[in-house]
Amino acid sequence: MQDTSYFVHSSAVIDAGASIGAGSKVWHFTHIMPSSEIGENCIIGQNVFIDRRVKIGNGVKIQNNVSVYQGVTLEDDVFLGPSMVFTNVINPRSFIERKTEFRPTLVCRGATIGANATILCGIEVGEYALIGAGAVVTRTVPPFALITGNPGKRTGWVSKAGITLEFNDKGEASCPESGEKYLLTGEAVINVLPSPGQKG
C-alpha cells in the first residue's frame, strides 16, 4: 500500500529502501535511489537525482535539474536553485574507479545555493550562507557569508532572511526585514539577537 503522507508524481522513480518524510512532494521525472533519506515537508522539483545514502533534512527545497550525489548532506531548510551542481570526486577519470574517494560536502541549516552555482566536493557551506547564481565555490564558506563570482569570493554578509547586512564601526548590524541583530568579529558573523521563536 502506497504511503499517502507524502506526494510522488507518477513519473518519478522512488527505489525500494528510500525514505521520504511526511508532507514532502516529489515532482516529475525525479529519481530517488535506495538508502537515501529525505526529511519532512521537502519539495523536490522536476528532473532531480538523489543518490544512494544522501541525507536531506526537513523543509529543504530542491529546484529543477539538480543532482545530489553520494557524500552530500543537506541540513534543514536548505534551498538549492535550478541547475546548481555538486561534485563528489576531486580528480575524476572515466578509466579509474574512484567510488571509495568521495569527498563529503555539508550544506548547513538555512543555506541557499543559487541557480547554476557549482560546489566543489569536500567543503562546508555554513549556516544561512548565500551562494550567488553562477558562483563556483572551491573552499569552505562561513555562516552568513555572501559568495559570488568565479572563483567564488565573499563579497558581503547576509541575515537569516537573506538580506545584505551593513555593519557599523562597532561591527554591529540589524536585518532591516526581521530586526535580528548581528555582530561581526574578524571574519565571522554571529546572530546575537534572534527573532522571537527562532534559534540563534
Role assignments for model-derived ranges:
Residues 170-175, 187-192:
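Short cysteine/histidine-rich zinc-coordinating motifs and their immediately flanking basic loops
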